[in-house]
Design a protein with these regions (language model features):
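Juxtacatalytic helix/coil linker segments
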Residues: 1-87, 91-96
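Broad gene-expression machinery/nucleic-acid interaction feature
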Residues: 55-58, 107, 155-159
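Protein kinase-like catalytic core scaffold
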Residues: 57-59, 99, 135, 168
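Anionic group-transfer/hydrolysis microenvironments
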Residues: 64, 104, 165
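Activation segment
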Residues: 67-70, 112, 171
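Short, surface-exposed helix-loop/turn micro-motifs enriched in polar/charged residues
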Residues: 70, 78, 100-102, 120, ...
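Conserved helix-loop-beta segment at the catalytic/binding core of cyclic-nucleotide signaling proteins
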Residues: 86-119
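Catalytic beta-strand-to-alpha-helix segment of the class III nucleotidyl cyclase homology domain
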Residues: 115-183
């Protein structure tokens, strides 16, 4: 992983977020949720009240003590921090060919493998493991230096968990509102 290149990309995301601070208004913004993203599965071909089983390597990353940190540093610095941290993690997942399943607050879930991927267990686990290591390195070499340079002294600390195993893929919700999820 080229951390110098990652630094440039994340600095760009961060600078864009800084520029938008003055423009943010207290209005509801339209968002599109990550949906229908479990690799190899499509909501159109899944039925409610049914499921399929598959094997994936799952990576979950989240910030440690993020609520305490946010209370201490305030809204603007938390906003800027998230616009350095989340894009960095997503860039690294993309680099290691993972599939982002969900972004939940300051946590991100990504998958490797699955029956339809052609990726064997050993390689899926290796890719996820290398991704996790690069995430930890990126905090030290990219994200925290960008924040510190801008006067945000409280460094972001992350935890990364990786597991391989059987998951249940299902279409869950009601006709108007549903998602494809893996448990």
């Amino acid at each position: 992983m080229d951390f110098d290149e990652l630094y440039k990309k994340i600095l760009h995301h961060y600078e864009q977020a800084k520029k938008s601070l003055d423009k943010i208004e207290k209005t509801m913004l339209e968002h599109s949720a990550l949906s229908d993203v479990v690799p190899g599965y499509n909501a159109d071909f899944l039925e409610f009240e049914s499921y399929q089983e598959d094997n994936f390597t799952v990576l979950f990353v989240d910030m440690r003590k993020s609520t305490r940190r946010a209370k201490k540093i305030g809204g603007k610095k938390t906003f800027l921090s998230m616009h350095a941290y989340i894009p960095a993690m997503l860039e690294i997942i993309s680099y290691h060919q993972g599939k982002v399943i969900d972004i939940m607050g300051d946590g991100i879930m990504a998958f490797w493998g699955g029956k339809k991927s052609g990726l064997i267990k050993k390689n899926a686990v290796r890719k996820a493991g290398m991704c996790g290591l690069d995430m930890i390195k990126a905090m030290e070499k990219v994200v925290n230096p960008i924040l510190k340079k801008d006067g945000i002294e409280w460094e972001i600390d992350i935890g990364v968990g990786i597991a391989y195993g059987n998951v249940i893929v299902t279409k869950i919700g009601i006709e108007q509102f549903y998602d494809v999820k893996a448990f």
